Amino acid sequence: MDKVVLEKTINKYVDMVYRILFCHLGNKADSDDAFQDVFIKLYKCNKEFESDEHLKAYLIKMTANIANDYHRKNFWRNKIELQDIYQAVSDCDDDNYEVMDAILHLPNKYKNVIYMYYFEDYKANEIAGILNIPVNTVYSLLKRGKEKLKGVLDESL
């Protein structure tokens, strides 16, 4: 990937990649480090993308994988600082603020699917393809994730 295309890609997907990383990692420092890793890895890859949607799907999958790598490396640092959470979701309006905060507290397997389905508007079959899981598993994760999300939101009220 050449530098001009990379720069355009970064400008187009900066918010999406950062939100995914922050949802996974829960703090600004790790998210910043992982953000750099995502785009360095994208720059080094020699893959041709069929369309912007193909690039976006590849970027989401790669971002989630890099976030998981950071979890494995830093499993002992599993503490999320509230100040960082509030900073990341400060762009949300009041109605979405509590929902975003609750999503941050879900396990990663639910976060991924809920984020891609509701925030990136992917269909279940597209999510299944990106995450290499069956479509029915996507539906199950969505259902269970919504139930867990409802439980978290009910507790906060």
Label each PLM-derived region with a short phrase:
Residues 1-7, 81-83, 93, 129-130, ...:
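C-terminal edge and immediately downstream basic/flexible tail or linker adjoining helix-turn-helix-like DNA-binding
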Residues 1-19, 23, 32, 43, ...:
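A short, charge-rich alpha-helical start-of-domain segment used by transcription regulators
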Residues 14, 18, 39, 107, ...:
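C-terminal flanking helix
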Residues 19, 33-40, 53-65:
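Structural recognition of an alpha-helix C-terminal capping motif at a helix-to-coil junction
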Residues 50, 61-81:
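Arg/Lys-rich amphipathic alpha helix in sigma70-family domain 2
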Residues 64, 68, 131-155:
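DNA-recognition helix of helix-turn-helix
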Residues 69, 77-104, 123:
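Internal acidic/polar
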Residues 113-117:
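A short pre-motif secondary-structure segment
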